[in-house]
Amino acid sequence: MTEAYRTNPALRICVDRLHQGAIEGRVFSSRLTAPLVFTDWSNLVLRLERIFDQQKLPQAFQGARTFLYDVHGMENIASGDTAAGMSMELVRAQYGQLSTFDMVVVTRRYSSWQGWVDWLDGSVRQPFTGVLELLHIMEEKVRSLE
């Protein structure tokens, strides 16, 4: 396993199911020790935000402000030690039943995310400049498969 992969910020998003309008699936990454299961897009974003905060990657440009610390709700699958994360082979072998794509969040500015989505079906890479744009891109793609 190369060090370049271990520090790879890509998240493999596997969309498995569309159930009563909600998208369900799993996330795999060398930055996780176990799959992250999500029940809809907002659940995915909130859980990933917690992991980004824990790992401080990508670094938020402003400190998070909170009045309540929820220690019990923190994700326990985020790998602080890159050697403890999932292997490249395991991550690359994962595919969703409906759709699969790799998402890279490069920065977290203006209380949002910036990065791109790489579709594994050969579609053109799509950049995003905020979480709402990302949600629209993902939703549009998955709905087009129905």
List PLM regions with ranges.
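Short aromatic-glycine-(Arg/Gly/Cys) micro-motifs in beta-strand/loop hairpins
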Residues: D16-L32, V106-G122
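Intrinsic disorder/low-complexity detector
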Residues: M1-I13, H19-G21, L46-S111, K141-E146
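Mixed-charge, glycine-accented linear interaction segment located at domain edges/termini
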Residues: L32-L36, V45-D53, Q114-E146
